């Protein structure tokens, strides 16, 4: 284990707080090797280390989204292998706020659909998947219809938060389709 890795692991495991995550995010901003190691640890599926590494990544994205851009392809490609719902929720939160490269649209649509329709997926992950799906589908009437059909499936058992998210997206969909004449 190299020095950067051990020091970062120690920082992550000593204390789990918002303040500690902000500190680690600041270190990752200043030192690319720390950022790279955070990404590696996040996707290592070593609990609780993976969860604790993911949180500073989200903080880094919140303050400096440009630092995460080089990792977006990697995030997308690693999603299927994430075992922790907490890590998944964090990565989906980041992906829901950035532009997914077009070459991964099909993969992300399938992934998000499976997560949205899986009753075991956390509410936050479902909400992020709805945002991602809509962002990709927004220019495609057939995909918007599929999203609307998924909403019909979800509605009977959806939480209040998911119903609210679906309502917001449904209004955007109606506006988009009426503006474009679909």
Task: Give residue spans per PLM region.
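Alpha-helical scaffold domains
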Residues: 1-182
């Amino acid at each position: 284990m190299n020095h950067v890795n051990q020091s970062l692991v120690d920082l992550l495991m000593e204390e789990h707080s918002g303040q500690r995550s902000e500190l680690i995010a600041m270190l990752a901003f200043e030192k690319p090797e720390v950022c790279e190691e955070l990404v590696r640890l996040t996707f290592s599926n070593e609990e609780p280390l993976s969860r604790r590494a993911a949180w500073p990544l989200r903080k880094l994205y919140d303050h400096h989204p440009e630092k995460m851009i080089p990792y977006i392809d990697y995030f997308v490609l690693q999603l299927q292998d994430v075992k922790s719902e907490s890590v998944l929720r964090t990565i989906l939160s980041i992906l829901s706020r950035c532009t997914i490269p077009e070459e991964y649209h099909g993969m992300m649509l399938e992934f998000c659909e499976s997560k949205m329709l899986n009753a075991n997926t956390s509410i936050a992950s479902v909400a992020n998947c709805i945002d991602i799906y809509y962002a990709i589908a927004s220019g495609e009437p057939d995909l918007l219809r599929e999203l609307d059909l998924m909403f019909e499936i979800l509605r009977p058992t959806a939480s209040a938060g998911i119903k609210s998210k679906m309502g917001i997206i449904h209004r955007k969909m109606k506006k988009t389709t009426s503006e474009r004449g679909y």
